[in-house]
Amino acid sequence: MTTISTDIRAVWRDSSLGTERELRLPSGSLHVFDRGSGDPILLIHGLVVNANLWRAVVPELAHAFRCVTIDLPFGSHRISMPGTPVDPPGLAGLVIETIEAMDLGPVTLVGNDSGGVVCQLVAARRPDLVARMVLTSCDAYDNFPPKTFAYLKLAARVPAGMAILAAALRFPAIRALPIAYGWLSRVRIDRRASDSYALPVAVTRDIRDDLRRVLRGLDKRHTRSTAETFADFDRPVLLAWSEDDRFFPTQHAHRMAADYPDARIHWIPGARTLSPEDEPAALADAIVAFAAGAE
């Protein structure tokens, strides 16, 4: 287990996330951030971002709810997890262990991007831990990963692929390209947050190795098999989908709304995939209304 300490830009977390601590789980350790009181909301990020993704959403929720965010080993984390399974089922297991260790369940589970796949798996495996679920634009069905990002799987398998990827992410101009973060958000991501997303894989080999294993585990069989369980999850589901998403089609929101027994769609205007970056207030309003039973 290794904690990054070589570059302060890679370890920065926004204070708006709340109190930080290291949570020791059976499968490994990760950082959690806790703010507010009331019914718990657990916010799950996706690939090559971290808890900072929710930095503008948490303050909007924490006046009425307990908001917990975590750094999953998606490549922008600080504690490496060399012995921990980090394929989608393994990541879902970490979320399940977090809910149990923090006594959060049943929780409102919120996922974005590939974090949405993790949430789908948690809901399928342990519905008793999930009171309701919010899926923002995310992978589903055969769209895992989106074709634009298929090169990431190749980078994880060819010699020096991860080193080249990590070196490229040091440069903000590269991050702004469509094949990086460029088309994931409409707004330019705050430099401090962007550095915290991109630099961990660049400065620490152990984090890079974790990301390699995550990328190798991206497989449509996980989303296909999970989709077969949607009909069995009878808790409320909100699909807070971005209207301007370039990777996750609106048709998938409609399909998921039909496949989950108690699901509805709420469109987030003006947002691309990373709606917590583009439209945090609108997303937070939708989550609050849904969690309070008004949506």
Segments from the language model and where they lie:
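Conserved HGGG/HGGXW glycine-rich cap/lid loop of the alpha/beta-hydrolase fold
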Residues: 33-77
